């Protein structure tokens, strides 16, 4: 018999010491202790209810598991690599404490459905937490949008000045992205919150278990419908990592803008000293380390998704030892996403903006050129012809080192006789912004309404 192994009856030689260390997962799956114990208590309770094991044994099992939980949380539990994983560590300790009753706990289940349960329980709780952290960032964004309503900045395409927009409109763009990110987390929760326990190793169990009762005890919405699928797939974990990658891409784009905007060349925003660091050699430096790290950690989260996808891509049904490698990418993604969301929310809430600098930048780069084209369209000129006229006007301005607002009426009329005195009312920054009143536009009235709508939906 392989010494000290709960599965060792079939073996005549002990496990190689290095193999034991190589195959053990306790160093990282021990974080599932609470879920493992909770699942075992529910399983034991069901076994007693169904008359599969004596009620007295159930009482001993539940009491023993609660004691083990207290020991783990007090730091008094010694995890053993020789026992491989969190399941075997807890079960072995339970049997030491209560004897044969502990050996009955595993009746009607396998580690295959047990670990699937633990991961689902763990991810279910974390999905709720991640959604709460998203809400914190959404609140910070709404705060900035509301506090700075009316501030005009340049909108960019290709990182070139395009059209003037409200800073609040820009902030609310990230609000929309984060709303979708939260919705993806909530959708993932629906598919995660189903009970796999009862699937056994792959084919189910011969015991008259009550899976629906266990699902009720553990607050699951239902049970999985195919035992093979229950232990074979980790698509719920992949879905979470995919949603997290999209979320992190949004944070990375936001980070990139804050990094740019905080440079001396832009000076649109100033990040709080609390979220920046200095240089070891250049005393004048104030480095935006937090957004840079968030941008960098996006690659880490994306890598975790690829790791999970690659892990699962060629596995035959049902369980394979490869699947032990699912936990570290999942755990790391959870930790990274929560940390990034928390620090980002605090940073956004505390950042200061520079309205004058934004307005000055918005006025440069011929940002109201499209408004001139729209003006000409309203005068009866087809848009493509209007586009050509404004393009020639811009070239004239470049050649004469001037901007659109500096043109006189006479100069305007060199390009079109339909241009009149009212052109000057159409090319101010305020007029440009407020003219975009359609749903989703940057007009003040629209942005104010979207902020109010966002606050109601929190």
UniProtKB/Swiss-Prot annotation:
GO terms for molecular function: argininosuccinate lyase activity. Its EC number is 4.3.2.1. It catalyses: 2-(N(omega)-L-arginino)succinate = fumarate + L-arginine. It is found in: Cytoplasm. Pathway: Amino-acid biosynthesis; L-arginine biosynthesis; L-arginine from L-ornithine and carbamoyl phosphate: step 3/3. It is an enzyme of class 4 (lyase). Its main location: cytoplasm. NCBIfam families: argH (TIGR00838). This is Argininosuccinate lyase. It comes from Citrifermentans bemidjiense (strain ATCC BAA-1014 / DSM 16622 / JCM 12645 / Bem) (Geobacter bemidjiensis). The gene is argH.
């Amino acid at each position: 018999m392989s010494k000290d192994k709960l599965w060792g009856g079939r073996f005549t030689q002990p496990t190689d010491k290095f193999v034991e260390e190589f195959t053990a997962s306790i160093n990282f799956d021990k974080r599932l202790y609470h879920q493992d114990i909770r699942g075992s208590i529910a399983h034991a309770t069901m076994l007693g209810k169904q008359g599969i094991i004596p009620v007295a044994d159930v009482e001993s099992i539940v009491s023993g598991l609660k004691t083990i939980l207290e020991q783990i949380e007090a730091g008094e539990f010694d995890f053993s690599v020789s026992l491989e994983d969190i399941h075997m560590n807890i079960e072995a300790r339970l049997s030491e404490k209560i004897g044969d009753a502990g050996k009955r706990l595993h009746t009607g289940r396998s580690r295959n459905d047990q670990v699937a349960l633990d991961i689902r329980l763990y991810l279910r709780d974390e999905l709720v937490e991640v959604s709460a952290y998203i809400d914190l960032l959404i609140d910070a964004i709404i705060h900035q949008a509301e506090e700075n309503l009316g501030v005009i900045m340049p909108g960019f395409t290709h990182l070139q000045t395009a059209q003037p927009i409200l800073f609040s409109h820009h902030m609310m763009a990230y609000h929309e992205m984060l709303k979708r990110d939260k919705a993806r987390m909530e959708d993932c929760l629906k598919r995660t919150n189903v009970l796999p326990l009862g699937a056994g190793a792959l084919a189910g169990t011969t015991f008259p278990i009550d899976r629906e009762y266990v699902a009720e005890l553990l607050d699951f919405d239902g049970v999985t419908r195919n035992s093979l699928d229950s232990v074979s797939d980790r698509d719920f974990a992949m879905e979470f990592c995919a949603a997290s990658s999209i979320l992190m891409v949004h944070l990375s784009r936001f980070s990139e803008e804050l990094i740019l905007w905080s440079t001396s060349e832009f000076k649109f925003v100033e990040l709080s000293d609390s979220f920046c660091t200095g240089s070891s050699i250049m005393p004048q430096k104030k480095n935006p380390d937090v957004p840079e790290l968030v941008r960098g950690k996006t690659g880490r989260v994306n890598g975790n998704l690829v790791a999970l996808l690659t892990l699962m891509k060629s596995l035959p049904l049902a369980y394979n030892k490869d699947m032990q490698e699912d936990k570290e990418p999942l755990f790391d993604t959870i930790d990274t996403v929560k940390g990034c969301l928390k620090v980002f929310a605090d940073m956004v809430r505390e950042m200061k903006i520079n309205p004058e600098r934004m307005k000055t930048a918005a006025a440069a780069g011929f940002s109201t050129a499209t408004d001139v084209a729209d003006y000409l369209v309203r005068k009866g000129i087809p848009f493509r012809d209007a586009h050509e006229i404004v393009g020639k006007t811009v070239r004239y301005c470049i050649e004469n080192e001037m901007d659109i607002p500096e043109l006189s009426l006479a100069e305007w009329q060199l390009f079109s006789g339909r241009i009149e005195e009212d052109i000057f009312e159409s090319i101010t920054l305020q007029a440009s912004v407020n003219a975009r009143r359609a749903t989703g536009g940057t007009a003040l009235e629209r942005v104010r309404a979207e902020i109010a709508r966002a606050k109601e939906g929190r």
